[in-house]
Amino acid sequence: MSYSKFDLTFKIGQYLDRHLVFPLLEFLAAKETYDQSELLQAKLEILSKTNMIDYVTDIRRMLYPEEDTPEEIIQRRGVVLSELQELQDAVEPVLRLMQRDDVMKTIETMRDPKTLINHLSTNKEYEFKIEMIDSMYRLAKYRYECGNYVESASYLYFCQLVMSPTDKNYLSVLWGKLASEILVQNWDGALDDLTKLREFIDNGGAGSTASNMQALQQRTWLVHWSLFVFFNHVKGRDLIIEMFLYKPLYLNAIQTMCPHILRYLATAVIINRSRRNALKDLVKVIQQEAYTYRDPITEFIEHLYVNFDFEAARRKLNQCQAVLLTDFFLIACLEEFVENARLMIFETFCRIHQVISIGMLAENLNMQPDEAECWIVNLIRNARLDAKIDSKLGHVVMGAQPLSPYQQLVERIDSLAVRSEALTSLVERKHKARNQDIRWGAQEF
């Protein structure tokens, strides 16, 4: 099975700044998923529209080792250095201020941009002029285009402090700061910037003239940029569920513009044991969007919680592993994903069956019987499950926790509902197989 059809790199890349696309291409190159010369060509196309001239030269040498560096690239390098120096000279007083810890501490305590600008302008020692704000923004953008993301983040931070939210460049500053923090992998800073940007967009900060469609586009971009933060920050796996599943404006953006993001939402729910309560809501969304997007990860959820088809879920789990291995954002979650997916299969299986064959369970978990028995023993010990293993018969016998009459009723109803759905699904599948039109073969919808 070719997993390149499940690769979302180029789909996601449409919603990213070109600098953010570059790490994804580097990942693909390391994975050798695509032809290396095609990836080098894609890198060159991205870099040619930036000021990263030295990098452009290196990529060209790899692509065209027999050719000399074109004169226009050599000349452009000189132009970039000259323009950079000119921009730095225009804001030299501000750059000096930023080197002084005492001044920066004072600046950071002033929350009102007008008060801050007045403080900087009236103090002759600072040599600050109001037009330097726009110059600082231009310098930050230029530094960013040169690939100097640390400096860019620092300059954009200053712009955030002195700019009014109504400034024409304020929204661009927020986007630029978020991108810079992502590219230097400062995940705490990136999360702060993501929160500021989301609040700004949601509060209509993009301007009263912004249409609903423009706001939808902004949220769609933010959803994609946030993947870098959510799959790297320690709080990310909770925050992605809150934002993507429980903030209607963002769920609407995903359903309307980018249902492929359901892969990342589903993965976050699977690896987050403390958020199992989100499963029902996730299943509803996956079912609603099944006609527009599906992949092994969303299908795994469907097979397990809609169809109760454990054999199909087992097959999909195999495919899920291959998908995660080739996904820039998810590869680090692979072990957690497999462990939690197996746990979900086990839990669902146990809700339907009281006595479970270890052999059957091992088959559904893609494990050898001995390995499955050891896994179940550890699970019973760590999760404090009321279950026993009969090694002679090769069975797991589920016990019953003492419950109040009310809890017993709720559990009984819940269990009957699960069993009823499982039986209904089984009957439907058998009926479909028996009445299948041989002209069309097997059909999956």
UniProtKB/Swiss-Prot annotation:
Known role: Component of the eukaryotic translation initiation factor 3 (eIF-3) complex, which is involved in protein synthesis of a specialized repertoire of mRNAs and, together with other initiation factors, stimulates binding of mRNA and methionyl-tRNAi to the 40S ribosome. The eIF-3 complex specifically targets and initiates translation of a subset of mRNAs involved in cell proliferation.
Compartments, record wording: Cytoplasm
InterPro entries, per database record: eIF3e, eIF3e_N, PCI_dom, WH_DNA-bd_sf
Main location: cytoplasm
All copies of domain PCI, residue ranges: 230-403
One GO cellular component term noted in the UniProt record for this chain: eukaryotic 48S preinitiation complex
GO-annotated biological processes: formation of cytoplasmic translation initiation complex
Gene encoding the protein: eIF3-S6
Family, similarity comment: Belongs to the eIF-3 subunit E family.
Gene Ontology MF terms: translation initiation factor activity
Keywords (A to Z) from UniProt: Cytoplasm, Initiation factor, Protein biosynthesis
Top-rank taxon, per record: Eukaryota
Xref: SMART domains: eIF3_N (SM01186), PINT (SM00088)
Subunit structure: Component of the eukaryotic translation initiation factor 3 (eIF-3) complex.
Entry protein name: Eukaryotic translation initiation factor 3 subunit E
